Amino acid sequence: MVDWSTLPEELLHFIAARSFSLVEYKRFSSICVSWHSSVSGVKKNPFHRRPLIDFNPIAPSETLLEDHVFSCNPGAFLSRAAFFRVTLSSSPSKGWIIKSDMDTNSGRFHLLNPLSRFPLRISSESLDLLDFTVSEIQESYAVLKDAKGRLPNPGYQRSALVKVKEGDDHHHGILGIGRDGTINYWNGNVLNGFKQMGHHFSDIIVHKGVTYVLDSKGIVWCINSDLEMSRYETSLDENMTNGCRRYYMRFVDCCGELYVIKRLPKENSRKRKSTLFQFSRTAGFKVYKIDKELAKWVEVKTLGDNAFVMATDTCFSVLAHEYYGCLPNSIYFIEDLEPKVFQLDNGNGSSITRKSESSESSFEMFFPSFL
Protein backbone atom coordinates (compact mmCIF):
# COMPACT_ATOMS: atom_id res chain seq x y z
CA MET A 1 0.00 0.00 0.00
CA VAL A 2 1.25 3.49 -0.90
CA ASP A 3 2.21 5.72 2.03
CA TRP A 4 0.48 8.95 0.99
CA SER A 5 2.18 10.90 3.78
CA THR A 6 5.54 10.61 1.99
CA LEU A 7 4.49 12.29 -1.26
CA PRO A 8 6.93 14.99 -2.44
CA GLU A 9 6.14 18.47 -1.14
CA GLU A 10 6.12 19.84 -4.70
CA LEU A 11 3.35 17.40 -5.63
CA LEU A 12 1.36 18.32 -2.51
CA HIS A 13 1.60 22.00 -3.46
CA PHE A 14 0.36 21.11 -6.95
CA ILE A 15 -2.64 19.21 -5.56
CA ALA A 16 -3.54 21.85 -2.96
CA ALA A 17 -3.40 24.67 -5.49
CA ARG A 18 -6.03 22.89 -7.57
CA SER A 19 -8.56 22.40 -4.79
CA PHE A 20 -11.86 23.47 -6.32
CA SER A 21 -13.27 25.00 -3.15
CA LEU A 22 -12.17 26.42 0.16
CA VAL A 23 -13.65 23.42 1.95
CA GLU A 24 -11.65 21.01 -0.20
CA TYR A 25 -8.51 23.02 0.58
CA LYS A 26 -9.17 22.75 4.30
CA ARG A 27 -9.93 19.08 4.00
CA PHE A 28 -6.63 18.56 2.18
CA SER A 29 -4.69 20.15 5.03
CA SER A 30 -6.35 17.88 7.60
CA ILE A 31 -5.39 14.54 6.00
CA CYS A 32 -2.10 14.06 7.83
CA VAL A 33 0.81 15.99 9.37
CA SER A 34 2.91 16.15 6.20
CA TRP A 35 0.00 17.38 4.10
CA HIS A 36 -0.85 20.03 6.68
CA SER A 37 2.78 21.16 6.85
CA SER A 38 2.94 21.51 3.07
CA VAL A 39 0.34 24.29 3.13
CA SER A 40 1.09 25.80 6.54
CA GLY A 41 2.50 29.26 7.07
CA VAL A 42 1.02 32.69 6.46
CA LYS A 43 1.81 32.74 2.74
CA LYS A 44 0.80 29.16 2.02
CA ASN A 45 -2.24 28.77 4.24
CA PRO A 46 -4.49 31.74 5.13
CA PHE A 47 -6.79 29.55 7.25
CA HIS A 48 -6.87 28.60 10.91
CA ARG A 49 -4.27 26.09 12.14
CA ARG A 50 -7.06 23.79 13.32
CA PRO A 51 -9.08 22.61 10.29
CA LEU A 52 -12.44 24.14 11.16
CA ILE A 53 -15.27 25.65 9.18
CA ASP A 54 -16.57 28.51 11.35
CA PHE A 55 -20.27 29.18 11.09
CA ASN A 56 -21.64 32.69 11.38
CA PRO A 57 -24.48 32.54 13.94
CA ILE A 58 -27.59 34.53 13.11
CA ALA A 59 -28.21 37.49 15.39
CA PRO A 60 -31.82 37.88 16.62
CA SER A 61 -32.13 41.02 14.49
CA GLU A 62 -31.07 39.21 11.30
CA THR A 63 -33.66 39.36 8.55
CA LEU A 64 -35.56 36.11 8.04
CA LEU A 65 -38.53 35.45 5.79
CA GLU A 66 -40.79 34.49 8.67
CA ASP A 67 -40.00 37.80 10.40
CA HIS A 68 -41.69 39.66 7.51
CA VAL A 69 -39.09 42.44 7.74
CA PHE A 70 -36.57 42.95 4.97
CA SER A 71 -33.60 45.22 4.44
CA CYS A 72 -33.82 47.67 1.56
CA ASN A 73 -30.21 48.76 1.27
CA PRO A 74 -29.31 49.78 -2.30
CA GLY A 75 -26.91 47.78 -4.44
CA ALA A 76 -27.39 44.35 -5.99
CA PHE A 77 -25.08 41.63 -4.68
CA LEU A 78 -23.99 38.36 -6.29
CA SER A 79 -24.22 35.43 -3.89
CA ARG A 80 -22.71 32.01 -4.56
CA ALA A 81 -24.14 29.19 -2.49
CA ALA A 82 -22.68 25.69 -2.37
CA PHE A 83 -24.22 22.35 -1.48
CA PHE A 84 -21.98 19.93 0.39
CA ARG A 85 -22.18 16.24 1.15
CA VAL A 86 -21.06 15.75 4.74
CA THR A 87 -20.15 12.33 6.12
CA LEU A 88 -18.55 11.06 9.28
CA SER A 89 -14.92 10.37 8.39
CA SER A 90 -15.28 7.03 10.17
CA SER A 91 -18.45 6.11 8.24
CA PRO A 92 -18.47 7.67 4.74
CA SER A 93 -21.13 5.47 3.10
CA LYS A 94 -24.04 7.76 4.06
CA GLY A 95 -24.17 11.49 4.59
CA TRP A 96 -26.15 14.69 4.87
CA ILE A 97 -26.60 17.77 2.68
CA ILE A 98 -25.73 21.22 3.97
CA LYS A 99 -25.83 24.49 2.06
CA SER A 100 -23.88 27.66 2.71
CA ASP A 101 -22.67 30.91 1.32
CA MET A 102 -19.77 32.96 2.62
CA ASP A 103 -19.57 36.32 4.34
CA THR A 104 -17.38 38.43 2.06
CA ASN A 105 -15.90 40.38 4.99
CA SER A 106 -15.17 37.70 7.60
CA GLY A 107 -14.82 34.63 5.37
CA ARG A 108 -17.20 32.74 7.65
CA PHE A 109 -19.87 30.46 6.28
CA HIS A 110 -23.59 31.19 6.53
CA LEU A 111 -25.55 27.95 6.75
CA LEU A 112 -28.71 28.08 4.64
CA ASN A 113 -31.81 25.97 4.32
CA PRO A 114 -30.86 23.51 1.54
CA LEU A 115 -34.22 23.98 -0.20
CA SER A 116 -34.14 27.79 -0.04
CA ARG A 117 -31.63 30.57 0.56
CA PHE A 118 -32.84 31.53 4.00
CA PRO A 119 -30.55 31.13 7.03
CA LEU A 120 -30.69 28.23 9.44
CA ARG A 121 -30.62 28.79 13.16
CA ILE A 122 -27.98 26.40 14.49
CA SER A 123 -26.41 25.55 17.81
CA SER A 124 -22.97 24.55 16.51
CA GLU A 125 -20.34 27.20 15.87
CA SER A 126 -17.98 25.06 13.80
CA LEU A 127 -17.47 21.78 12.00
CA ASP A 128 -14.28 19.83 12.70
CA LEU A 129 -12.87 18.47 9.45
CA LEU A 130 -10.93 15.82 11.34
CA ASP A 131 -14.25 14.21 12.24
CA PHE A 132 -16.19 14.97 9.05
CA THR A 133 -15.54 14.71 5.33
CA VAL A 134 -17.04 17.57 3.33
CA SER A 135 -17.36 17.48 -0.48
CA GLU A 136 -18.99 20.11 -2.68
CA ILE A 137 -21.67 18.59 -4.92
CA GLN A 138 -23.52 21.57 -6.42
CA GLU A 139 -23.42 25.34 -6.65
CA SER A 140 -26.00 28.03 -7.27
CA TYR A 141 -25.97 31.76 -7.86
CA ALA A 142 -28.38 34.50 -6.92
CA VAL A 143 -28.45 38.25 -7.49
CA LEU A 144 -29.67 39.53 -4.14
CA LYS A 145 -31.12 42.94 -3.48
CA ASP A 146 -28.26 43.69 -1.07
CA ALA A 147 -25.37 41.94 0.66
CA LYS A 148 -27.24 41.37 3.94
CA GLY A 149 -30.65 40.44 2.60
CA ARG A 150 -31.90 37.11 1.29
CA LEU A 151 -34.36 38.28 -1.32
CA PRO A 152 -33.39 37.83 -4.99
CA ASN A 153 -33.56 40.80 -7.31
CA PRO A 154 -36.93 40.67 -9.15
CA GLY A 155 -35.07 40.35 -12.45
CA TYR A 156 -33.14 37.29 -11.26
CA GLN A 157 -35.48 34.74 -9.70
CA ARG A 158 -33.42 32.00 -11.38
CA SER A 159 -29.76 32.67 -12.17
CA ALA A 160 -26.77 31.03 -13.84
CA LEU A 161 -23.11 32.00 -14.06
CA VAL A 162 -22.06 32.14 -17.73
CA LYS A 163 -19.04 33.09 -19.80
CA VAL A 164 -19.72 35.99 -22.13
CA LYS A 165 -17.52 37.08 -25.02
CA GLU A 166 -16.47 40.73 -24.97
CA GLY A 167 -14.15 41.47 -27.85
CA ASP A 168 -11.36 38.91 -27.80
CA ASP A 169 -11.85 38.10 -24.12
CA HIS A 170 -14.37 36.09 -22.13
CA HIS A 171 -15.79 37.36 -18.85
CA HIS A 172 -18.18 35.94 -16.32
CA GLY A 173 -21.66 37.35 -16.06
CA ILE A 174 -25.06 36.35 -14.75
CA LEU A 175 -28.07 35.41 -16.85
CA GLY A 176 -31.32 35.37 -14.94
CA ILE A 177 -35.02 34.74 -15.35
CA GLY A 178 -37.08 37.66 -14.08
CA ARG A 179 -40.31 37.49 -12.13
CA ASP A 180 -42.06 38.65 -15.31
CA GLY A 181 -40.54 35.78 -17.32
CA THR A 182 -37.93 37.87 -19.15
CA ILE A 183 -34.22 37.12 -19.45
CA ASN A 184 -31.74 39.62 -18.01
CA TYR A 185 -27.96 39.86 -18.05
CA TRP A 186 -25.82 41.31 -15.25
CA ASN A 187 -22.05 41.76 -15.35
CA GLY A 188 -21.66 43.14 -11.85
CA ASN A 189 -22.43 46.72 -12.75
CA VAL A 190 -25.18 46.80 -15.35
CA LEU A 191 -28.61 45.20 -15.33
CA ASN A 192 -29.80 44.80 -18.90
CA GLY A 193 -33.00 43.45 -20.40
CA PHE A 194 -32.11 40.63 -22.79
CA LYS A 195 -33.53 40.67 -26.30
CA GLN A 196 -35.37 37.39 -26.62
CA MET A 197 -37.34 35.28 -29.04
CA GLY A 198 -39.41 33.02 -26.82
CA HIS A 199 -42.38 33.24 -24.50
CA HIS A 200 -42.23 33.72 -20.74
CA PHE A 201 -39.22 31.81 -19.45
CA SER A 202 -39.27 29.50 -16.45
CA ASP A 203 -35.73 28.21 -15.84
CA ILE A 204 -32.09 28.37 -16.88
CA ILE A 205 -29.21 25.90 -16.57
CA VAL A 206 -25.63 25.48 -17.76
CA HIS A 207 -25.38 21.85 -18.86
CA LYS A 208 -22.10 20.47 -20.21
CA GLY A 209 -20.92 24.01 -20.92
CA VAL A 210 -24.07 25.01 -22.85
CA THR A 211 -26.59 27.51 -21.47
CA TYR A 212 -30.21 26.39 -21.88
CA VAL A 213 -33.40 28.28 -21.06
CA LEU A 214 -36.90 26.85 -20.96
CA ASP A 215 -40.01 28.83 -21.80
CA SER A 216 -43.61 28.31 -20.72
CA LYS A 217 -44.46 26.63 -24.04
CA GLY A 218 -41.90 23.89 -23.44
CA ILE A 219 -39.48 25.29 -26.02
CA VAL A 220 -35.82 24.87 -25.10
CA TRP A 221 -33.43 27.62 -26.22
CA CYS A 222 -29.64 27.83 -26.26
CA ILE A 223 -27.70 31.01 -25.47
CA ASN A 224 -24.13 31.30 -26.74
CA SER A 225 -21.24 33.40 -25.43
CA ASP A 226 -22.30 36.27 -27.72
CA LEU A 227 -25.66 36.30 -25.89
CA GLU A 228 -27.42 35.09 -29.03
CA MET A 229 -30.39 32.75 -28.74
CA SER A 230 -31.20 29.79 -30.94
CA ARG A 231 -33.95 27.24 -30.65
CA TYR A 232 -32.87 23.80 -29.44
CA GLU A 233 -33.61 20.99 -31.87
CA THR A 234 -36.12 19.28 -29.56
CA SER A 235 -38.94 20.83 -27.50
CA LEU A 236 -41.60 19.43 -25.22
CA ASP A 237 -44.87 18.53 -26.94
CA GLU A 238 -47.79 20.88 -26.41
CA ASN A 239 -49.73 18.27 -24.43
CA MET A 240 -46.83 18.09 -21.96
CA THR A 241 -46.99 21.79 -21.19
CA ASN A 242 -50.73 22.40 -21.52
CA GLY A 243 -51.89 24.73 -18.75
CA CYS A 244 -48.36 25.22 -17.44
CA ARG A 245 -47.29 28.62 -16.21
CA ARG A 246 -43.80 29.97 -15.71
CA TYR A 247 -41.97 28.65 -12.64
CA TYR A 248 -43.93 25.40 -13.01
CA MET A 249 -41.13 23.81 -15.07
CA ARG A 250 -37.54 23.30 -14.01
CA PHE A 251 -34.35 21.84 -15.46
CA VAL A 252 -32.29 19.23 -13.62
CA ASP A 253 -29.05 17.45 -14.49
CA CYS A 254 -29.14 13.76 -13.59
CA CYS A 255 -26.24 11.43 -14.38
CA GLY A 256 -25.07 13.79 -17.12
CA GLU A 257 -28.46 13.96 -18.84
CA LEU A 258 -30.88 16.87 -18.99
CA TYR A 259 -34.33 16.43 -17.45
CA VAL A 260 -37.36 18.70 -17.13
CA ILE A 261 -39.61 18.64 -14.07
CA LYS A 262 -43.19 19.84 -14.46
CA ARG A 263 -45.09 20.83 -11.33
CA LEU A 264 -48.78 19.90 -11.37
CA PRO A 265 -51.02 22.35 -9.45
CA LYS A 266 -54.11 21.28 -7.52
CA GLU A 267 -56.16 24.27 -8.54
CA ASN A 268 -56.41 26.80 -11.32
CA SER A 269 -53.21 28.83 -11.00
CA ARG A 270 -55.04 32.00 -12.07
CA LYS A 271 -56.95 32.01 -8.80
CA ARG A 272 -53.83 32.75 -6.78
CA LYS A 273 -51.12 35.33 -7.20
CA SER A 274 -47.94 33.50 -8.16
CA THR A 275 -44.63 34.51 -6.57
CA LEU A 276 -41.38 32.65 -6.15
CA PHE A 277 -42.60 30.80 -3.05
CA GLN A 278 -46.40 30.98 -3.34
CA PHE A 279 -47.86 28.70 -5.98
CA SER A 280 -51.07 26.83 -6.21
CA ARG A 281 -50.71 23.76 -4.02
CA THR A 282 -48.75 20.98 -5.67
CA ALA A 283 -50.66 17.87 -6.73
CA GLY A 284 -47.60 16.10 -8.10
CA PHE A 285 -44.87 16.22 -10.71
CA LYS A 286 -44.07 14.79 -14.10
CA VAL A 287 -40.53 14.23 -15.30
CA TYR A 288 -39.28 14.28 -18.90
CA LYS A 289 -36.00 13.56 -20.67
CA ILE A 290 -34.84 13.38 -24.27
CA ASP A 291 -35.07 10.00 -25.98
CA LYS A 292 -32.13 10.22 -28.38
CA GLU A 293 -33.44 7.49 -30.67
CA LEU A 294 -36.90 9.05 -31.00
CA ALA A 295 -35.42 12.56 -30.94
CA LYS A 296 -38.12 13.85 -28.61
CA TRP A 297 -38.92 14.42 -24.96
CA VAL A 298 -40.59 11.47 -23.25
CA GLU A 299 -42.09 11.06 -19.79
CA VAL A 300 -39.90 9.28 -17.24
CA LYS A 301 -41.82 6.84 -15.06
CA THR A 302 -39.06 6.05 -12.58
CA LEU A 303 -35.87 7.70 -11.36
CA GLY A 304 -34.44 4.46 -9.98
CA ASP A 305 -32.14 5.12 -7.04
CA ASN A 306 -31.99 8.82 -7.89
CA ALA A 307 -33.75 11.59 -5.99
CA PHE A 308 -34.19 15.14 -7.29
CA VAL A 309 -33.57 18.08 -4.97
CA MET A 310 -35.63 21.01 -6.24
CA ALA A 311 -34.37 24.04 -4.33
CA THR A 312 -35.63 27.52 -5.08
CA ASP A 313 -32.34 28.50 -6.74
CA THR A 314 -31.25 25.27 -8.46
CA CYS A 315 -32.14 21.63 -9.07
CA PHE A 316 -29.83 18.63 -8.92
CA SER A 317 -29.90 14.88 -8.37
CA VAL A 318 -28.41 12.62 -5.71
CA LEU A 319 -28.11 8.88 -5.24
CA ALA A 320 -30.59 8.05 -2.50
CA HIS A 321 -28.50 5.30 -0.90
CA GLU A 322 -25.73 7.82 -0.18
CA TYR A 323 -27.86 9.97 2.15
CA TYR A 324 -29.62 9.37 5.46
CA GLY A 325 -33.37 8.94 5.03
CA CYS A 326 -33.35 9.88 1.35
CA LEU A 327 -36.17 8.23 -0.58
CA PRO A 328 -35.29 6.85 -4.03
CA ASN A 329 -37.48 7.71 -7.02
CA SER A 330 -38.58 10.95 -5.38
CA ILE A 331 -38.52 14.75 -5.67
CA TYR A 332 -37.74 16.94 -2.65
CA PHE A 333 -39.11 20.48 -2.78
CA ILE A 334 -40.33 23.33 -0.59
CA GLU A 335 -43.81 24.80 -0.53
CA ASP A 336 -45.10 27.50 1.82
CA LEU A 337 -41.72 27.26 3.59
CA GLU A 338 -42.28 23.58 4.44
CA PRO A 339 -40.08 20.77 3.05
CA LYS A 340 -42.03 18.14 1.15
CA VAL A 341 -41.22 14.99 -0.81
CA PHE A 342 -43.07 13.58 -3.81
CA GLN A 343 -42.66 9.88 -4.54
CA LEU A 344 -43.21 8.88 -8.14
CA ASP A 345 -45.68 6.10 -8.84
CA ASN A 346 -44.03 2.79 -8.00
CA GLY A 347 -47.14 0.70 -8.60
CA ASN A 348 -48.85 1.82 -5.40
CA GLY A 349 -49.62 5.32 -6.61
CA SER A 350 -47.69 8.55 -6.16
CA SER A 351 -47.80 10.58 -2.96
CA ILE A 352 -46.66 13.82 -1.32
CA THR A 353 -45.44 13.85 2.28
CA ARG A 354 -44.87 16.98 4.33
CA LYS A 355 -42.11 17.14 6.91
CA SER A 356 -44.64 17.95 9.64
CA GLU A 357 -46.65 14.83 8.76
CA SER A 358 -43.76 12.36 8.74
CA SER A 359 -41.44 10.92 11.33
CA GLU A 360 -38.91 13.30 9.72
CA SER A 361 -36.61 10.40 8.84
CA SER A 362 -37.36 11.02 5.14
CA PHE A 363 -35.90 14.52 5.55
CA GLU A 364 -32.99 13.55 7.78
CA MET A 365 -30.41 14.33 5.12
CA PHE A 366 -31.33 18.05 5.28
CA PHE A 367 -31.26 18.31 9.08
CA PRO A 368 -28.06 16.72 10.44
CA SER A 369 -27.89 16.15 14.17
CA PHE A 370 -24.45 17.76 14.51
CA LEU A 371 -25.73 21.28 13.72
UniProtKB/Swiss-Prot annotation:
Pfam families: Beta-prop_KIB1-4. Residues 2-49 form the F-box domain. InterPro entries: KIB1-4_b-propeller, SCF_F-box_domain. Disulfide bonds: none annotated. It comes from the Eukaryota. This is Probable F-box protein At1g65740. The lineage of its organism: Eukaryota, Viridiplantae, Streptophyta, Embryophyta, Tracheophyta.
